[in-house]
């Protein structure tokens, strides 16, 4: 009979105790690490380090960065980690001038806000005040200014809301270069053309057109103006076809005086 191996238990007991002690130490270290990490997190969230440190705003044109930050509801006391991007975006797009908004968190404590504003397609002149008209047809009656704008044409003599709405749609279809070349658009209906308008261009010409064909006709304005003698000003008629009538006699200084078609 083969003799079996003899295991000396006294030799294994110290090793088992050492393993148990090491295992207990590792467990204690893990518990202590978790505890201190928890304490650090609590201190971080309660300290200024856990609050929003900076808000960056981009894409705004007419609304100031301060106004947009105020609309977002974010302050220096706001917890960085409690900022909900989607909720802030919804708050911002409730403003009539903001078309789109994107909010992004950037470590360690910066909030980046990018907005797209509705384009100001024109300004309605009423009671010596210029009211912005957005491309979506909304008139900003609370944003009126006494200073004449230069970024969009001014609508003068427009009282008919339906006519303004139709004109807004036409202006929105125009290239930016043509829209920027206009100074004023006067509502001047006649018996023959009930939707007739007179456009005063920045280059000194006048354009007589109708609202219903405004975008289609005015989109060709650069080519039409380029074919004319720049030293001879007058009225470009675009109601039916297109033709040019020079001022005769020379145009007076009265801004409301126009040449009848």
Curated annotation (Swiss-Prot):
Domain of life from the UniProt record: Bacteria
Transmembrane segments: 28-48
Topological domains annotated Extracellular: 49-261
UniProt-annotated stretches for the region Alpha: 47-117
Pfam families documented for this protein: FtsQ_DivIB_C, POTRA_1
Membrane topology type: Single-pass type II membrane protein
Region (Beta): 118-230
Region spans: Gamma: 231-260
Cited HAMAP family: DivIB
Protein's name according to its UniProt entry: Cell division protein DivIB
Species of the source: Geobacillus kaustophilus (strain HTA426)
Classification of source organism: Bacteria, Bacillati, Bacillota, Bacilli, Bacillales
């Amino acid at each position: 009979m083969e003799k079996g191996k003899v295991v000396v238990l006294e030799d294994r007991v110290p090793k088992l105790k050492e393993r148990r002690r090491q295992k207990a130490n590792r467990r204690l270290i893990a518990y202590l690490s978790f505890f201190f990490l928890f304490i650090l997190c609590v201190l971080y969230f309660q300290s200024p380090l856990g609050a929003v440190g900076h808000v960056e705003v981009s894409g705004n044109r007419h609304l100031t960065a301060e106004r947009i930050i105020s609309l977002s509801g974010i302050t220096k006391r706001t917890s960085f980690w409690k900022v909900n991007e989607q909720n802030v975006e919804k708050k911002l797009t409730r403003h009539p001038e903001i078309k789109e908004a994107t909010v992004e968190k950037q470590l360690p404590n910066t909030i980046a806000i990018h907005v797209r504003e509705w384009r100001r397609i024109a300004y309605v002149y009423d009671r010596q005040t210029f009211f912005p008209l957005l491309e979506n047809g909304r008139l900003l009656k609370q944003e009126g200014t006494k200073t004449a704008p230069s970024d969009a044409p001014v609508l003068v003599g427009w009282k008919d809301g339906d006519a303004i709405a139709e004109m807004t749609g036409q202006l929105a279809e125009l290239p930016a270069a043509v829209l920027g070349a206009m100074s004023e658009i006067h509502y001047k209906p006649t018996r023959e053309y009930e939707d007739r308008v007179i456009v005063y261009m920045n280059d000194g010409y006048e354009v007589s057109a109708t609202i219903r064909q405004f975008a289609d006709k005015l989109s060709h304005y650069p080519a039409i103006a380029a074919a004319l003698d720049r030293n001879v000003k007058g009225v470009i008629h675009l109601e039916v076809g297109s033709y040019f009538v020079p001022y005769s006699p020379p145009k007076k200084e009265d801004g409301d005086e126009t040449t009848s078609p």
